[in-house]
Amino acid sequence: MKKKIFAMFALLLLFIPSFVFAKSYDVDEYLKLDFDDDWYVFTKSNIKDNKELEELGVSEEYMENLFKSSNVVVDAILFADDNNDTKEVFVRTTETKDLYNLNDNTDSYINEFADGFISSVKEQGIEVVNSKVYKSNNNAYVYLEYSDSNLNVIEYFTVVNGNGYAIQVQKTNSFTESEKDSFEEIIDKASFKILKQEKNDDNNKEQEKENNKSSNYVTNIIVGAIIGALVGALYGLIYTKRKAKKNKSEK
């Protein structure tokens, strides 16, 4: 009888879906991102005494240097059986004095901005394979797919509260449609605390001048700070360590 009950229970489990829970991370004072719990996610505020960093054999000092040297505020990694399918997500930020909130502008300005942004990326020698304006959750992004440093990259870029945010995922192999959808879901769930720019008469005049500037003027400054694949971050370090350990064990 007990065996029969156990068999029925085991069969029932086959039809119960497994759930992957998401956790919310504070990127900075304005942005929160959700990642499923199978991601390793590191931010400026959570690396101290972080057990997952210890598990990966990565030092707090290494992460601090990465954050300082690359305008990075988030480094998240999702391991795959095939190293070439391991995905790494970065969020990079840069100040944008000439633009406060991208989505506060007209569609024509946003499209012009996107065109200027894409042109500036191409001028960096980066091969852009797909691009568009993407709108989600009351925000506007410039969407890019490109190749750089033998890595494939998908990037969403926006400007909120006078800060440019580049949210990108990269891996060696090409992205599947399912992977693109999964990353898009992270973007769709991104939560920005959007502040309205305080304006007086002088500010209005200055803003009008800034909006009349060529989008290329604005985007050339931004692109130089946050575009391109990041080589030698978590994935590079962990892969190198694992390879060295494997070589040592084979001797």
Model-derived segments and spans:
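Bacterial N-terminal signal peptides
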Residues: 9-17
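Sec/Tat signal peptide C-region and signal peptidase I cleavage site
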Residues: 18-24
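Proline-anchored loop/turn motifs at beta-strand termini and strand-loop-strand connectors
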Residues: 28-48
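Surface-exposed amphipathic alpha-helical segments
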Residues: 37-41, 165-215
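C-terminal single-pass membrane-anchor helix
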Residues: 201-251
